[in-house]
Amino acid sequence: PAGEKAFARLANKTWNKVDNVLPIYDVDLVTLDALQERLGLYRKQHKAGFGGWQMNNIASVPQEVRSVFDLMKRNTQQDWEHIIGRMHRVTEALEGYIQTLEAAREEGKVAPRRQVDIVIEQTAAYYAPGGFFDELAAEVAEAVPSLKDEAAAGAEAAKEGYRRLNSYLVEKLQPVAPSRDAVGRKAYSLHSRSFLGTTIDLDETYAWGVTELESIIARQSEVAEEIEPGASIERAQQLLDEDPARQLH
């Protein structure tokens, strides 16, 4: 929670200084525009109650903590030592995340049940025997055999962090997580802008999506008829799955 508050203060402080920034080169105009857009969006999201308590199966804290290891260099022994060191810090990072989730829970802010369930499944896979961190430790040991024991200890430390998070999600959040996924038009528009970097006409986009989906379904029905006269799309899928010529072994 303290980290989120500090980030919000910094964002507001930076926002108040942006208007006084004078671009020198043309590229600075682009940078300044992007900075204003992202900071402005963040301030709106923060005001709307967005925060680390929200989770999903792709881009939320549980995945970001794990995926940071994918971005770390793997060229020298020092690189591998840094990876081990970071594995030892996973528990600390996730403990802070648990505090954020708990503070939000006390305010009635809990992610939808569907999202909590999938993150429970993902985190269990992270600390399972032979999971991500065990594989990472093995990768370290293969690159620098002398670091094998340290890597194994780091993996166990990281797994413990995810084990604790998983327990918290199961015991505290899952029982009170709302079953409703819908967030409402206002929140959806902010999420949309966050991912797209621009504002779109939601009604027009939705109508376009429905039209495209209907076109796809119509084409699927045509192909299903070609595969077997009178076949439904589901029947055509079954026939294709059962076709030895289309199976990978």
Predicted regions and their residues:
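N-terminal maturation segment of proteins
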Residues: 1-249
